[in-house]
C-alpha cells in the first residue's frame, strides 16, 4: 500500500512538471521562514556571517515582492528587477535564491533554467592611470580616507579583508606586512605588504585615534562608501576597492613580479604555499620581492 502511495505521488509530480509545471509554495509568515533560513545558512551551510546575512535579506526581499509565493514565475519576476544592475549584483541575488529555494526549501525545480550573468574578467575592466589615482587621492579630505585608499591600492586585498583586519594581530608594522585571516570555502587568506606612501598616512591615522578598538580602520559603512564616491568623481571613472585590487595585480605584473607571488599577495595561492611564507625566511623573501618591485601610487 505504501509503495503504491509513493508511486502515485511520484506520478502526480511528474504529471505536474510535464503539464502545468511544478506547484508553487506559499508562505504567510515571511519573517518566520526568513529566520529559519538564516539559521540554516549559518548552521547547515556554514556560511560566513556576512554571506548568511546577505542571503537572508535576499530571501526577505523576494518573499515580500512575491507576497510569499515561491514559483518559477515569481523568481523570474524578482530577478527581472536586477537586469539593469551589474552582473555581479544579479549573480549574488541568484546565488541567494538558489540557497533559499533549491537547498533550504528543497525545490530545485523552481530554479531550473535560470543562469548566471556573464561577469567580465579582470582584463575586461578599465584600469585607472596613475594620474587618475592621484586625482582620486587628492579629492579625499582627511587622513583616514587617504590611509584607506592607499592601503587598498598597495596591498591588493579584497574589500572585506581590509575592513576585518585587527591592528594588534594582523599587521607587522616593522615589516609593513599584512597577514589576512580571511579564509572561506571559496577565498583564501593572503600575505601582503603596504608601501612607504601608505605607511605615512596609516601611522598618522592610527596616531590620531583615541580609541583602542581592534579594527585597523574604524569606519561606518556610509562614510566608507563616500570615499569611493569622491574618488570616482575626481578620477572620472568608477574607483572601488575591487578596481584598486585589479590595478595592484596589473601594476605588479608590469613591474616584473611573477604571477605566483602576486597570487600570494592577493590570497589566490594554495594553503600549502602560503604556509611556507607566513614566517621567518619565507616572509622576508616575500618582502624583498614586494620592495624590489617599487610599487608607487602617487609618484
Task: Report residues per predicted region.
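Short, polar N-cap/turn motifs at the start of nucleic acid-interacting alpha helices
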Residues: 170-173, 238, 257-277, 299
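DNA breakage-rejoining catalytic core of tyrosine-based enzymes
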Residues: 119-135, 185-197, 211-217
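N-terminal core-binding DNA-recognition domain of tyrosine recombinases/integrases
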Residues: 1-4, 8-24, 35-124, 212, ...
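Catalytic-site neighborhood detector that most strongly recognizes the C-terminal catalytic loop/helix
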Residues: 127, 266-298
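Conserved tyrosine-mediated DNA breakage-rejoining catalytic core shared by Y-recombinases
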Residues: 155, 164-204
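Basic, Lys/Arg- and aromatic-enriched nucleic-acid-binding interface segment
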Residues: 121-122, 130-159, 245
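Short basic/aromatic active-site micro-motif
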Residues: 221, 237-256, 264
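Active-site/catalytic core of tyrosine-dependent DNA strand-transfer enzymes
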Residues: 195-238, 248
